[in-house]
UniProtKB/Swiss-Prot annotation:
Identification of the protein by name: Phenylalanine--tRNA ligase alpha subunit
Family under the similarity heading: Belongs to the class-II aminoacyl-tRNA synthetase family. Phe-tRNA synthetase alpha subunit type 1 subfamily.
Catalyzed reactions: tRNA(Phe) + L-phenylalanine + ATP = L-phenylalanyl-tRNA(Phe) + AMP + diphosphate + H(+)
Domain of life where this protein originates: Bacteria
Pfam families: Phe_tRNA-synt_N, tRNA-synt_2d
A single MF term (Gene Ontology): magnesium ion binding
Organism: Albidiferax ferrireducens (strain ATCC BAA-621 / DSM 15236 / T118) (Rhodoferax ferrireducens)
Cofactor binding mode and count: Binds 2 magnesium ions per tetramer.
Cofactor dependence: Mg(2+)
Compartments reported by the entry: Cytoplasm
Keyword list, A-Z: Aminoacyl-tRNA synthetase, ATP-binding, Cytoplasm, Ligase, Magnesium, Metal-binding, Nucleotide-binding, Protein biosynthesis
Record-annotated membrane-spanning stretches: none
Keyword Lyase: no
Length: 357
């Protein structure tokens, strides 16, 4: 029995010295393997009497069980130690400051467009979106732009495949074509509602006013610090029976003061020329404070809608009158955020764009 106790003690000591699962398996082989100590003891029972075999075998089995218990205990201890080491290596100190994750945000021009839409929406204007590939008729002819106008030149306009020789397709040079599209659909809907149907000729009956802005991307052959071949425009239109230039002044003054959050902002309307409005005016603003104080800055073009354009909307110009305006959201964003180079908005530099979050 002393011999068996010695074997069990030796096995326990060997198991305790094992520092890895591999070491433990090697120690196991010394005592429980095919050539291990327990196997040798079992082989030595061959020369014993039957009664001695029973006694000796039972004692050896008890010793084997004690060794297996010690083996399993050590195996579990090594597994626990390995898990603990892994947990410590992967531990997260919740008291440490978190890592700042950058959050995306809208582009400054998109923020400007949203602001424009919200302000005009509060004044009762609809927002209309239209195709960026436009026909020559909607982009020029319907807006009273003559065929020999410089804007139709390939030096100023991107022409694209499609269309016909007399009516080519192009990338729209302004978002005004959507005003025509919106007005034509507005008149058609009202004709149907009042039962006029497809009667030929201009509409001269009573009709709800047309109030709409058309923001979107536009394209021209131009590129410098203040111009881009792709830029944004927002055109506005208000047509009714009693709309005057006074309404234009009121609407745009209220818009500018709301947009720039400045009640002391001063506006002036300078006489100008646009083929689709008559009379026409450039709109300048003057800040009374800040880095731009005292300077006149051009922000929009405007005017009373030309009678030919009213006709192209399907309306009778002797009854309906209105005003239109067009401004550059990119330009407004430059003024609002103090940016000097328009190209910065479109270079995709995250260091620049992240300032507007």
């Amino acid at each position: 029995m002393n011999e068996l106790n010695s074997v069990v003690d030796s096995a326990k000591a060997a198991f305790e010295q094992a520092r890895t699962p591999a070491d433990l398996e090697n120690a196991k082989a010394l005592f429980l393997g095919k050539s291990g100590r327990i196997t040798e003891l079992m082989k030595g029972m061959a020369a014993l009497a039957v009664d001695e075999k029973k006694t000796r075998g039972a004692a050896i089995n008890l010793a084997k069980q004690a060794i297996e218990v010690a083996l399993n205990n050590r195996r579990q201890a090594l597994a626990d130690a390995e898990l603990q080491a892994q947990l410590q290596a992967e531990a997260l100190d919740v008291t440490l400051p978190g890592r700042q994750r950058g959050q995306g945000s809208l582009h400054p021009v998109s923020l400007t467009l949203e602001r424009i839409e919200a302000i005009f929406g509060s004044m009762g204007f609809d927002v209309a979106q239209g195709p960026e590939i436009e026909s020559d008729w909607f982009n020029f002819t319907a807006l009273n732009t003559p065929e020999d106008h410089p804007a139709r030149s390939m030096h100023d306009t991107f022409y694209v495949e499609g269309g016909t020789a007399t009516a080519p397709n192009l990338l729209r040079t302004h978002s005004s074509p959507m005003q025509i599209r919106y007005a034509v659909q507005h008149v058609k809907r009202h004709r149907a509602a009042v039962g006029v149907g497809q009667v030929e000729g201009l509409f001269s009956g009573d009709m709800p006013e047309i109030r709409v802005i058309a923001p979107g991307r536009t394209y021209r052959v131009d590129s410098d610090a203040t111009h881009s071949p792709m830029f944004h425009q927002c055109e506005g239109l208000w047509v009714g029976e009693n709309v005057s230039f006074k309404d234009l002044k009121f609407v745009f003054t209220d818009f500018c003061r709301t947009f720039f959050e400045s009640d002391d902002l001063v506006l002036r309307f300078r006489p100008s020329f646009f083929p689709f409005t008559e009379p026409s005016a450039e709109i300048d603003i003057q800040f009374q404070s800040g880095p731009l104080a005292g300077r006149w800055l051009e922000v929009a073009g405007s005017g009373q809608v030309h009678p030919n354009v009213i006709r192209n909307m399907g309306l009778e110009p002797e009854k309906y009158i209105g005003f239109a305006f067009g401004m550059g959201p990119d330009r407004l964003a430059m003024l609002r955020y103090g940016v000097n180079d328009l190209r910065l908005f479109f270079d995709g530099d995250v260091r620049f764009l992240s300032q507007f979050q």
